[in-house]
């Protein structure tokens, strides 16, 4: 299964490269993994692989959008998504016109569970009928939203609460929205398999709830990475505004057809090598933040203490070097007033940026020499400047936070963009003595 998956992964990687050939053309002739790079200058904004293609179809571009009366300038990033899910399709057209005949979307209102159930039903099962045996203690069968709630529960998109409650007025979280969409896209089994992440000897990691869903949602681009207003970035437990939900539904319904099978194959049989307690602790600590957003200068998984190294951040999240710092660095009583609550103490890593980390090593590692816990450095635009770093966890996988993907994931780095742009590695965690 793993060998088959690896072969198909390589073939699909080639297909993906053809799809984004304009973006990747500059990298095709370069060396994949050089152990002795040139002298690196100071770092630049973190990079990452191109996002999977998705967007408006040609037919949609010919469809005149509804002139929404309540979209503000800071909502413009969501306008294509809103037009797709509420203008062309009507899946999220939940608010009637006002007295003047103006259409409203209420982009900043929290999305209710009953609205989300209806949007999912309209998008993925418009002709379905509910199982009459599904009942709710807080939603009568005569309620117009009952049908959609029952269909959502029947298909496993949304679950009932204690006492057969649906809680129709409650707001949805990112975790709930992303689970609905991952399952609607047919990736339920893949997400469940990812939840069982283990080392070769069968020792499973204590993955957080919906770990597989969070990982696949990041890879699918279901959460918008707001680079210009990072205060709007969300974690898996954030209650979502309607414009954020619109983006998730937009992405899920406009992905190229090869993306889902590509990801299903890539994560099939994912397994990490056997490792000691220290390295295992790094992985266990890192995976709890999968699904957290990319924040430039971000280095904390909770509200920023003072003084942080890169200034106060708008919310929990990490840039690439911040995630590596957070996972590996030992508290020296200097930059961190509060030590992260990790099970491992950490190791000396005084540098904060990817380029500074890349320079401060006496031995630069080639890809074949990497071991779990090693840092991997990349030159995303091939200008002689390291602009990305992640933490290798073995068997071709790395704990990564990139601006293009939009946050923290476990990424396949043995082929594709990561291998093409890899320059060298650095060992922070000493190898065990023979």
Language-model features, listed with the residues they occupy:
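Secretory targeting and sorting signals
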Residues: 2-35
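Feature responds to low-complexity, polar/acidic, surface-exposed segments characteristic
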Residues: 34-79, 93-117, 121-147, 154, ...
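Solvent-exposed, polar/charged alpha-helical surfaces in well-ordered, non-transmembrane soluble domains
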Residues: 79-83, 87, 114, 118, ...
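Sec-exported extracytoplasmic/periplasmic mature domains
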Residues: 86-91, 121-129, 153-157, 182-190, ...
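N-terminal capping segments
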Residues: 264-340, 429
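Low-complexity, Gly/Ser/Thr/Pro-rich intrinsically disordered linker/tail segments
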Residues: 270-271, 419-434
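...with weaker cross-activation on analogous glycine-rich loops/strands in unrelated enzymes
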Residues: 272-273, 278-283, 325, 333-408
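Glycine-rich catalytic cores of cysteine/serine-nucleophile enzymes that process amide/ester linkages
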Residues: 293-318, 371, 378-421
């Amino acid at each position: 299964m793993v060998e088959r998956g690896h072969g198909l992964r390589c073939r699909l990687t080639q297909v993906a490269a053809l799809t984004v050939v304009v973006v990747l053309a500059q990298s095709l002739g370069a060396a994949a993994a050089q152990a002795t790079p040139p002298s690196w200058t100071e770092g630049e904004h973190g990079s990452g692989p191109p996002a999977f293609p998705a967007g408006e179809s040609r037919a949609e571009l010919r469809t005149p959008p509804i002139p929404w009366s309540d979209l503000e300038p800071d909502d413009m990033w969501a306008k294509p998504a809103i037009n797709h899910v509420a203008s062309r399709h009507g899946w999220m057209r939940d608010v009637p016109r006002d007295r003047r005949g103006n259409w409203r979307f209420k982009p900043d209102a929290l999305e209710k569970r009953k609205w989300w159930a209806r949007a999912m039903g309209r998008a993925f099962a418009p002709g379905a009928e509910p199982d009459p045996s599904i009942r709710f203690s807080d939603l009568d069968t005569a309620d117009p939203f009952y049908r959609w709630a029952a269909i959502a529960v029947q298909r496993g998109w949304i679950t009932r609460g204690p006492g057969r409650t649906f809680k129709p007025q409650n707001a949805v979280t990112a975790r709930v929205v992303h689970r609905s969409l991952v399952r609607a896209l047919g990736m339920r089994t893949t997400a469940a398999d990812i939840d069982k992440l283990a080392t070769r000897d069968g020792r499973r990691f204590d993955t957080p709830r919906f770990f597989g869903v969070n990982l696949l949602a990041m890879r699918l681009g279901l959460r918008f990475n707001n680079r210009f207003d990072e205060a709007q970035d969300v974690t898996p437990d954030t209650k979502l505004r309607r414009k954020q939900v619109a983006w998730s539904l937009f992405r899920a319904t406009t992905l190229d057809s090869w993306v889902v099978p590509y990801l299903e194959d890539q994560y099939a049989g994912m397994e990490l090598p056997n490792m000691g307690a220290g390295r295992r602790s790094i992985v266990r600590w890192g995976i709890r933040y999968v699904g957290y957003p990319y924040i430039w200068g971000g280095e904390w998984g909770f509200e920023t203490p003072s003084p942080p190294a890169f200034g106060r951040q708008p919310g929990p999240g990490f840039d690439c070097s911040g995630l590596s710092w957070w996972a590996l660095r030992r508290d020296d009583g200097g930059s961190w007033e509060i030590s992260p609550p990790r099970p491992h103490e950490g190791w000396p890593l005084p540098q904060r940026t990817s380029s500074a980390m890349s320079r401060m090593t006496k031995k630069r590692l080639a890809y074949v020499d990497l071991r779990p816990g090693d840092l991997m450095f990349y030159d995303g635009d091939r200008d002689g400047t390291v602009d990305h770093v992640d933490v290798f966890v073995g068997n071709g996988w790395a704990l990564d936070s990139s601006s293009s993907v939009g946050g923290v994931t476990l990424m396949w780095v043995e082929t594709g963009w990561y291998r093409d742009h890899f320059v060298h590695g650095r060992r922070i965690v000493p190898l065990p003595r023979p």
